Amino acid sequence: MTASLLMLVVLMTSFAADKWITNAQLSLPLLIAAVCATATAAVGIPLLRRLKMGQFIREEGPKTHQSKAGTPTMGGLLVVPVGVVLGSLITRDAVASQQLLSLAVLTLAFMLIGGIDDWSSLTKHTNTGLTARGKLLLQAMATAAFLAIAAWQGWISSSIALPFGLELPLGLMIWPLGLFVVLAESNATNLTDGLDGLASGCGALVFTGLALQLMLRGDNGDPALAGFCMAMAGAWLGFLVHNRNPARAFMGDTGSLAMGAALSGVALLSNSLWPLLVMGGVFVAESLSVIIQVWVFKATKGPDGQGRRVFRMAPLHHHFELGGTDEQSVVPAFWLVTAGLVLLGLVLRP
């Protein structure tokens, strides 16, 4: 699956949804956001280059990535606001507008946290920015504020909707779970952003999948949150024009953290945690590969400080790279898997 084919699939899917799903208006926010994001990135990337926002590549990473050094990062700054602003203007309904505003603030807060992390990395001339603990604390504070507003307004269900009419009642446990979901999803999308076009393509597909299942649930669906999803999908497709191999810019933590926050925020507000888990399976796999790699290495570490490794390198996409599969093959394969998981999530929607 090439980038052009992925874009065509998402576009045609939105047109088909508008035609066949009652109350669906998915293609307009997708198209407007895609065009605007393509333009803002085209204008902004040369500016990032002039400001010397070049990415540093870690030496222990795949050797083929060393040629990417100096590619402008913080590209999320150019497209996330496009998706957020356009997505927030979808509806005139008062309650839906308040939800979209809170979702926009959460997304932009994570973009800011990612931006601080990226900037810290650039000023230190390394591939590491904020400390893991410091970044996690900032993310937790932003998420807690979002959840507090949602709790006050009664926006989040205390049970998780599952397929076949089933529900998993959680009561007050939904709140710590909500915190975990936002932190886990944002860091999972961050880990996925390691190859040209990988996270932006997968993100566009998952946003589209969430929008479709939102419109297929209930009598009239949820056009406000579905429209927000399509605006975000369009923003990432617009960025993909510049981020596909060879990438002219990277989204950085600025974009990847915001992507995960937006996905999880939509899922929490719409009781779509199950669809997000299924459709975002690539994000889950990338994150689990890192957790497994670290845990096994520490558990088997000997006196020499060396331990066993389950994967050649984590996250998972590097495992395939070091196995001899080139980047231009790994990325489309992951897109294809994500597309399959989106279809599965639609079949198994609550």
Curated annotation (Swiss-Prot):
Any one Gene Ontology BP term: peptidoglycan biosynthetic process
PROSITE patterns for the chain: MRAY_1, MRAY_2
Catalytic activity as recorded in UniProt: UDP-N-acetyl-alpha-D-muramoyl-L-alanyl-gamma-D-glutamyl-meso-2,6-diaminopimeloyl-D-alanyl-D-alanine + di-trans,octa-cis-undecaprenyl phosphate = di-trans,octa-cis-undecaprenyl diphospho-N-acetyl-alpha-D-muramoyl-L-alanyl-D-glutamyl-meso-2,6-diaminopimeloyl-D-alanyl-D-alanine + UMP
Protein's pathway: Cell wall biogenesis; peptidoglycan biosynthesis
Role according to the record: Catalyzes the initial step of the lipid cycle reactions in the biosynthesis of the cell wall peptidoglycan: transfers peptidoglycan precursor phospho-MurNAc-pentapeptide from UDP-MurNAc-pentapeptide onto the lipid carrier undecaprenyl phosphate, yielding undecaprenyl-pyrophosphoryl-MurNAc-pentapeptide, known as lipid I.
Annotated InterPro entries: Glycosyl_transferase_4, PNAcMuramoyl-5peptid_Trfase, PNAcMuramoyl-5peptid_Trfase_CS
Cofactor(s) of this protein: Mg(2+)
Cellular component GO terms, alphabetical: plasma membrane
Enzyme class of the recorded protein, top EC level: transferase
UniProt keyword Cell division, yes or no: yes
EC number: 2.7.8.13
PANTHER family listed in its UniProt record: PHOSPHO-N-ACETYLMURAMOYL-PENTAPEPTIDE-TRANSFERASE, PHOSPHO-N-ACETYLMURAMOYL-PENTAPEPTIDE-TRANSFERASE HOMOLOG
A GO molecular-function annotation: phospho-N-acetylmuramoyl-pentapeptide-transferase activity
Alphabetical UniProt keywords: Cell cycle, Cell division, Cell inner membrane, Cell membrane, Cell shape, Cell wall biogenesis/degradation, Magnesium, Membrane, Metal-binding, Peptidoglycan synthesis, Transferase, Transmembrane, Transmembrane helix
Subcellular location, principal: membrane
Residue ranges crossing the lipid bilayer per the database entry: 28-48, 70-90, 100-120, 136-156, 164-184, 195-215, 221-241, 249-269, 328-348
Domain of life: Bacteria
Family listed: Belongs to the glycosyltransferase 4 family. MraY subfamily.
Membrane topology, record value: Multi-pass membrane protein
Name this protein carries in UniProt: Phospho-N-acetylmuramoyl-pentapeptide-transferase
Pfam families named in the record: Glycos_transf_4, MraY_sig1
Organism: Synechococcus sp. (strain CC9605)
Location within or outside the cell: Cell inner membrane
